[in-house]
């Protein structure tokens, strides 16, 4: 098995896959100091598609599980499938559900999926005109991939103008901000529901809540996620079934109608409003840090599940089995994140975990026998 990526999500995936009785050798490309404890790290970048293909062929790898969104959006699954290699993760046409927020809105609108009202702009002047008549607060989103940081909630017109100029003029998110969505601000509790699908069968995982702002009390800039917990009280069975029927199934059906067979995980970022669940965003991969709190409670064989998704046989599996426990995860980040941060600090205490505690590595690397920081989010 090959896991593509280097974050805490990939450490959690490699850790869980390694528990499967059907797992042979597990490789992680490029991996981190944590994945090295449960798998073999290989220094191949997530964007080096030919390097990954060679790795798969050299080691006779039977399944590739892709962690991050960038390689999926750039067609890694397409590349591997074209060479006959099974992959867990959608083709680029399906990954557009995350890589183009405007396309995701189009898909939702076509099926009347509940979501915030939004307008799309590729002209700064038109966007600036719009914000002067819009209700506050409003949400400005970069259309493309921005590592979870391309969403800004603006409480004043000045802040909205500054955000638009930063995204569209100064290109703070590169080409991701060439087009922006300006969306109504929805109030309610946010919930993530990750759903496995092989294009025919869909199976929800445990719901989770993640916390995006970097500071205590939900303050400061948005990040990829600073912590998460499973089984939020409001996301009961009725809530999950409503999300599946009103949101997940219609979106997958609309994509299928456009010729896109979606195989992998569809992450629905939801908000529980007074009118019911609405979509904030979709992602084409496992949430980080959500999957770090979900996988420790999964009692079924993750490798068997991923193989079934990749082969279109998810409907043949027995129902997923879960521990009745709950789990909480906290992200430890480098000072300065999500802006510029320092790296190279020695990490201590990794072996001093409380009973039942786990640590998944993200931005870490080995220097001799020491583990040092090498990224913004360091540990979960």
What name fits each language-model region?
Residues 1-93:
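ATP-binding N-terminal substructure of ATP-dependent carboxylate-amine bond-forming enzymes
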Residues 18-21, 34-36, 58, 88, ...:
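Solvent-exposed alpha-helices and their adjacent loops that cap or buttress functional pockets
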Residues 41-48, 119-123, 154:
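Short acidic-hydrophobic, aromatic-tinged amphipathic segments that line or gate anion-handling sites
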Residues 88-150:
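A conserved helix-loop-beta module that forms one wall/lid of the active-site cleft
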Residues 150-292:
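Internal nucleotide-binding/catalytic subdomain
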Residues 244-266, 283-354, 362-367:
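Active-site "cap" helix and flanking loop/linker of ATP-utilizing ligase/carboxylase catalytic domains
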Residues 356-380:
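Internal helix-turn-beta structural module
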């Amino acid at each position: 098995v090959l896991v593509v990526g280097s974050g805490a999500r990939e450490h959690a995936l490699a850790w869980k896959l390694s528990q499967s009785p059907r797992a042979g050798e597990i490789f992680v490309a490029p991996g981190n100091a944590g994945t090295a404890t449960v798998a073999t790290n290989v220094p191949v970048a997530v964007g080096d598609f030919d390097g990954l293909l060679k790795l798969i062929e050299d080691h006779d790898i039977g399944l590739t599980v892709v962690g991050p969104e960038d390689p999926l959006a750039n067609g890694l699954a397409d590349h591997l499938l074209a060479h006959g290699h099974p992959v867990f993760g959608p083709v680029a046409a399906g990954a557009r559900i995350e890589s183009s927020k405007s396309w995701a809105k189009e898909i939702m609108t076509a099926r009347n999926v509940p979501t915030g009202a939004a307008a799309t702009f590729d002209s700064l002047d038109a966007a600036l005109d719009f914000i002067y008549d819009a209700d506050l607060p409003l949400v400005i989103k970069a259309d493309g991939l921005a590592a979870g940081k391309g969403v800004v909630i603006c409480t004043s017109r000045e802040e909205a103008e500054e955000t638009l100029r930063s995204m569209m003029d100064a290109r703070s998110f590169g080409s991701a901000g060439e087009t922006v969505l300006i969306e109504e601000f929805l109030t309610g509790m946010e919930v993530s529901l990750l759903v496995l699908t092989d294009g025919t069968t869909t199976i929800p995982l445990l719901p989770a809540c993640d916390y995006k702002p970097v500071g205590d009390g939900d303050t400061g800039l948005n990040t990829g996620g600073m912590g998460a917990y499973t089984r939020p009280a409001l996301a009961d069975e009725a809530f999950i079934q409503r999300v599946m029927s009103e949101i997940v199934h219609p979106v997958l059906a609309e994509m299928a109608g456009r010729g896109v067979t979606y195989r992998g995980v569809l992450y629905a970022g939801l908000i529980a409003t007074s009118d019911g669940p609405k979509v904030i965003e979709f992602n084409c991969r496992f949430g980080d840090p959500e999957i770090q709190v979900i996988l420790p409670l999964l009692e079924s064989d993750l490798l068997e599940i991923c193989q079934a998704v990749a082969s279109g046989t998810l409907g043949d599996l027995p129902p997923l089995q879960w521990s009745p426990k709950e789990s909480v995860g906290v992200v430890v980040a480098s000072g300065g994140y999500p802006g510029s941060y320092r790296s190279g600090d020695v990490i201590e205490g990794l072996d001093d975990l409380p009973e039942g505690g786990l640590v998944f590595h993200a931005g870490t690397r080995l220097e001799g026998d020491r583990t040092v920081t090498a990224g913004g989010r360091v540990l979960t």
